[in-house]
Amino acid sequence: INDIASGYLGEAQLSGYKIVRIDTTSTNDTESYVAGLWHHDRVGNRLKVFVFLHDVDCDEGHPTEVAVGSHLLNYYRTDAMGASRFADEYVRNNYEVAKLCGPKGGGFVVDTHTLHRGAVEGSLARTVIVGEYHSIGKCAAMDALKLGLPCPSGDQFLV
């Protein structure tokens, strides 16, 4: 995975990881789980690696959904979280939407500059390990410039 990340981002490093669980009751709406809204992560290109800790069903398992090809967009404002959210109707009318699901031990790699969401719809819980890769020096430069952007994400265990 390190070679994939460096091939895509230039020299890259794993900056952290976290475990994410979407329950069927407490996070079945976008008010309690804001990552259920279509969004990009406000930091330009970075990769997240998702590893399924159990089977993730495509319809009922809260799969991550991505708007295919949206990683090519240029965003002119990234300072506020609200500016990174997109209406479901807009995304579905303008992009092919892919559901990222699969068996335990499987997973995927996604550029979080891509419009994506964790589906809030579903009757089965989803638990994944998420690793985050950035170009070496990118987060330090953002911090030095006091940009206040989530690089690395603030809710992970740093490596």
What do these predicted regions represent?
Residues 57-115, 138:
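Double-stranded beta-helix
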Residues 79-81, 113-159:
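Non-heme Fe(II)/2-oxoglutarate
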Residues 34-41, 100, 118-121:
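Short histidine-centered beta-strand/loop micro-motifs
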Residues 33-37, 81-93, 144-148:
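Short, surface-exposed loop/helix-turn segments at secondary-structure junctions
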Residues 1-66:
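Conserved double-stranded beta-helix
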Residues 47, 106, 127:
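Residue-level detector of short, conserved catalytic/binding motifs and their immediate flanks
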Residues 41, 52-56, 69-71, 113-115, ...:
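Histidine- and/or cysteine-centered catalytic micro-motif in compact active-site loops
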